[in-house]
Amino acid sequence: MSSQMLSPIAQRFEQLKHEKRLALMPFLMAGDPDLATTSEVLLSLQNSGADMVELGMPYSDPLADGPVIQAAAARALAAGTTPGKVLEMLTSLKGQLTIPVILFTYSNPLLNVGMEAFCERAAAAGAAGLVVPDLPLEEAERLSPLAEQQGLDLVLLVAPTTPADRMVRIGQRSRGFTYLVSVTGVTGERAQMETRVEGLVEELKQSSAVPVAVGFGISGADQVRQVRSWGADGAIVGSALVKRMAAAGEGQIAEEAGQFCRELRNAAD
């Protein structure tokens, strides 16, 4: 497949593979503490070595998220953040934000708008992919062609508890990359990641040509290096970044996010 045919996410992974580098993929919650800050942070992460960004759409009942990201979602909702406003903010960054943005949304907001309409709006705003953590594989099989029509990659998740045959199906149906959840349970920092993940990276890479990114529980440079040593293609860092941003002084959030991103970038190379 020529690079013209590849999605923005696939192109980025191809480039990194050629450079023998790990994709650094920070996660942040849109609208925490407000959307103006989110747009500053997105540009700061891009300038600090992020290869792509996962942007959370705040939702009132985030089942897959731990306390840090739940608190960020609550702050964003309290500030009046809505899916429509997130997409408006993203649209306003066109031309400035050139790294792929993957929207992380629960299925309820997506189904409220309608799968097709959501995909159209997300693509029009400049998103490159979607992650819907609570969407069953069977529903994902309905959403995937609608996303693909709009040039969006629907990224599917695999956990250490996923049965082997189902894991193969997910790996083969995921687009852009497969999101490997490194621990069972909700998102959050972990001092020790489950060593079983190393074997899962290998299994996924054997059964599918799609890159594998590890997320949930990566808290710093040491774990980014660990993920790299396992042969994964990307590392997703969420709670640790969100926590750093929440602790930063007013006006310092984008700078603090960029500083943390540079630390992780050094570990990823």
UniProtKB/Swiss-Prot annotation:
The alpha subunit is responsible for the aldol cleavage of indoleglycerol phosphate to indole and glyceraldehyde 3-phosphate. Keywords: Amino-acid biosynthesis, Aromatic amino acid biosynthesis, Lyase, Tryptophan biosynthesis. Pathway: Amino-acid biosynthesis; L-tryptophan biosynthesis; L-tryptophan from chorismate: step 5/5. Its EC number is 4.2.1.20. Tetramer of two alpha and two beta chains. One of its GO terms (cellular component) is cytosol. The lineage of its organism: Bacteria, Bacillati, Cyanobacteriota, Cyanophyceae, Synechococcales. It catalyses: (1S,2R)-1-C-(indol-3-yl)glycerol 3-phosphate + L-serine = D-glyceraldehyde 3-phosphate + L-tryptophan + H2O. This is Tryptophan synthase alpha chain. The active site is at 54 (proton acceptor), 65 (proton acceptor). InterPro entries: Aldolase_TIM, RibuloseP-bd_barrel, Trp_synthase_alpha_AS, Trp_synthase_suA. Transmembrane segments: none annotated. SUPFAM superfamilies: Ribulose-phoshate binding barrel. It is an enzyme of class 4 (lyase). It comes from Parasynechococcus marenigrum (strain WH8102). PANTHER family: TRYPTOPHAN SYNTHASE ALPHA CHAIN, CHLOROPLASTIC, TRYPTOPHAN SYNTHASE, ALPHA CHAIN. Belongs to the TrpA family. Pfam families: Trp_syntA. GO terms for molecular function: tryptophan synthase activity.
